[in-house]
Structures are given as structure tokens and as C-alpha cells.
Amino acid sequence: MLSGCGTDMKKILTADGGKWEVDEGSSKSTYTFFDDGKFSVYDSKDNAAGKYSYDEKNKKITFDVSGRGTFIMEKVEYKDGKINGEINDRETVFVKEK
């Protein structure tokens, strides 16, 4: 078995340039996912980078942000061009950037 992202979710995350927007109420963040398991994120105040992995069995994306720690998106589901899940029990939606 390969480590890292599950094949289908990795293809979804990285397709068409790999850019996704997350609306966090007061700000929007843009995540960019790369084929090598790395990602970057930026918003109007900050930017960061790290590694991601997808646990297909448990439907979780783990984000390891360089120098800042790890957070997990649980209950991950891809539907209608969006990735829905929960981070710290808060609903989070990644929308494919056009």
C-alpha cells in the first residue's frame, strides 16, 4: 500500500492547478495542493506551507504545517465540486477555485 494521500482524493485535490478556497467568515484562505504531498495556504494576513495526507479508511486529511503543528479535517466528503469536512468540530468547505 502506498503512503500519503489516497489516489482519488489526491487527484481531486491537485487537479487543475490544485487551488481551493476556504471561506472562514472574516477571511478567505487559498490552499494549493501539489502532487508531492505538499501544500501552501495564504490569506490576507499570513501564509504557510507543509505536507498533507489523506486517510481513506477514516475519511481524514491531515495537514502538517511547517513549524506550527498539525490539524485534521475529519468526515471528508467530495461532492458537487466541494470538499466538506470538520476541523475542530467546525464545518469547513473547500471550494475549487476557478
Show the residue positions of the predicted features.
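Contiguous, well-ordered beta-strand patches that form the walls/edges
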Residues: D23-F34, S40-V93
